[in-house]
């Protein structure tokens, strides 16, 4: 009997050690992992003589284990609240066959752009706010449109008056522009190594695909194109193809704080 108790205690301790050593983070967050095994095409930084891999965590509906860049990460669920909006133009909600075909084709275009991977640009993570306005809907909220559940809101909405300037929050190359069914006038920027951002519902775009944009450079103006309830900027950020929370990138000393909160692969 004593041996059985001893075995049970050992199993509990071993399980605790496994959990303690587990790499973890919150849904939609960005984490830094200290490791000696950094591949050439991974987004990483050298700091204080150590290598840090930067990972974007996906939105999850429940706490779950995800494989990201050859690393097992426990992504913890977070309740971001909910958002309920009413769209009076029902043709933007229940699509006819023509509009659905268009929206699906545009989704493929955007998905292809997100696969972009430019290792000639090294992102600084020193993000600036792309527009002066008021946050009207935060990342991660469960979305209801006309009281029907839809996909969660994986972006940051910033309300502003029509025509307010939208500028690049970080240096990047324009990889896609277009007027799309859902997102209206849209610009997508590649900041390098899988860090990508998009700007939707613009009134106008003044950049062309292929152009390198500097931080703070004007790229467009706030509008209400596409499926919207009013003028605002819909700002989406991707890291390793996952939609992350843009708001956290605006914090002071973001990268330095990542290093200080880093986790080790043992």
Task: Describe the residue ranges of each PLM region.
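Sec-dependent signal peptide recognition
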Residues: 1-10
């Amino acid at each position: 009997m004593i041996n059985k108790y001893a075995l049970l205690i050992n199993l509990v301790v071993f399980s605790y050690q496994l959990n303690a050593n587990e790499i973890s983070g919150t849904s939609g967050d960005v984490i830094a992992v200290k490791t000696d095994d950094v591949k050439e095409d991974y987004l990483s930084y050298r700091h204080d003589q150590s290598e840090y891999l930067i990972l974007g965590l996906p939105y999850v509906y429940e706490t779950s284990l995800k494989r990201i860049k050859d690393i097992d990460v426990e992504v913890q669920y977070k309740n971001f609240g909910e958002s309920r909006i009413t769209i009076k133009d029902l043709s933007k909600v229940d699509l006819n066959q023509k509009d659905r075909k268009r929206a699906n084709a545009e989704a493929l275009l955007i998905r292809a752009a997100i696969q972009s991977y430019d290792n000639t640009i090294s992102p600084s993570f020193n993000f600036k706010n792309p527009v002066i306005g008021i946050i009207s809907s935060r990342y991660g909220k469960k979305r209801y449109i006309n009281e029907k559940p839809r996909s969660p809101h994986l972006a940051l909405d910033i309300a502003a008056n029509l025509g307010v300037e939208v500028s690049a929050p970080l240096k990047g190359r324009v990889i896609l522009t277009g007027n799309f069914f859902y997102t209206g006038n849209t610009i997508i920027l590649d900041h390098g190594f899988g860090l990508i951002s998009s700007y939707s519902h613009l009134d106008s775009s003044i950049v062309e695909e292929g152009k390198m944009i500097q931080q703070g450079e004007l790229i467009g103006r706030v509008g209400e194109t596409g499926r919207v309830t009013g003028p605002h900027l819909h700002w989406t950020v991707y890291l390793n193809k996952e939609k992350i929370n843009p708001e956290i990138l605006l914090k002071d000393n973001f990268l330095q704080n990542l290093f200080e909160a880093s986790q080790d692969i043992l």
